[in-house]
Design a protein with these regions (language model features):
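Structural/interface elements that position substrates and couple domains in central-metabolism enzymes
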Residues: 1-199
Length: 199
């Protein structure tokens, strides 16, 4: 998938020393206050999300964190995953940390623009400390007045699924309206204008 301007962002931030890559998890998180988990959750044979990558990394984090961290789940995950991540980290540490659900709403081919100018940022946390840290992180990206929406972790996890389902419902609905317009000789573009009203 081609993402316009992504290559320039990579080059600029690598040259300026703001973006580096490593396979050494311990050194990667040593100075980080916020750790983003953006891991695959492929469907299993029964269709459920495979959380083994997320839970595995969470366990590894528990073994190596030395000070407070905010662990942010960006992946599309089932409701209750933040609790599982929290438990996986807790098995290996007594150090304070918080788990946040921060689902992404990026469109393919528009990911850079959607990230830099989000129409909304959803943050699920029950921790006031994590809330303040996440608010500070996203402040530069919501200057145009688009909201940061705070809620609990479970609600944030469900929000991603709800948004996906709502989009699919809108597309299906408009396809049905287009079929109806074709059969009745109506103009689908004129009918589509109903979205602008309060109907």
């Amino acid at each position: 998938i081609y993402e316009p301007h992504l290559d320039q962002l990579f080059e600029r931030n690598i040259k300026q020393g703001r973006l580096t890559f490593t396979t050494d998890l311990a050194s990667a998180i040593e100075k980080a206050k916020i750790i983003f988990l953006a891991l695959p959750t492929p469907p299993g044979e029964d269709g459920s999300a495979d959380l083994s990558y997320i839970i595995g990394v969470a366990g590894d984090l528990g073994k190596i964190i030395k000070d407070y961290k905010v662990i942010v789940d960006k992946s599309t995950v089932p409701v209750g995953t933040a609790d599982k991540v929290r438990e996986a980290v807790k098995k290996h540490t007594t150090i304070e940390f918080d788990v946040v659900s921060n689902p992404e709403f990026l469109r393919e081919g528009f990911a850079v623009d959607d990230f830099l100018k989000p129409d909304r940022v959803v943050i699920g946390t029950s921790s006031e400390k994590a809330r303040k840290i996440m608010e500070e992180l996203y402040k530069p990206y919501v200057r145009q007045g688009n909201p940061i929406i705070f809620m609990d972790e479970r609600s944030a996890e469900l929000t991603k699924y709800a948004a996906n389902a709502f989009l699919a419902t809108k597309i299906t609905f408009m396809n049905e309206i287009a079929n109806l317009c074709e059969k009745l000789g109506a103009d689908v573009d004129a009918v589509r204008g109903l979205r602008a009203g309060r109907a």
